[in-house]
Amino acid sequence: MMLPRRLWALGAALMILPMLAVTACASTAPPPPPESRNGRPDRGAELIAQYGCGSCHTIPGINRAGGLVGPPLTRFGARSYIAGQLPNNADNLRRWIADPQAVEPGTAMPNLGVSAIDAQDIAAYLYTLD
């Protein structure tokens, strides 16, 4: 009588394990931290056009921003990583925008001389793209 119960328990466990594995591996991007909302998104949009970011990137809401060199910035706020390696948070994004070569030497993204305040506003705009 104990054997059928053990077999039932083993069968149930074997059915549940794959579901747990899939659930554990599912990755949803964490929401950007509250400090990422600092800055002025409206000004950030203007700066993105001014610095010519759309020459390399496709950026929603920015006129003539259909570049295909860099990755599209669609749904940027929902991403887990910046440049494929940095956790997506406001500090990392501001550092990346201001001086990408200091963050990842040899990256294709050029250093455009973006000031700290401009980087903050550009980051604020990008975080609206979620």
Task: For each feature predicted by the language model, list its residue ranges.
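C-terminal motif of bacterial Sec signal peptides marking the signal peptidase cleavage site
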Residues: 21-24
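Short, structured helix-loop boundary elements
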Residues: 7, 38-41, 70, 90
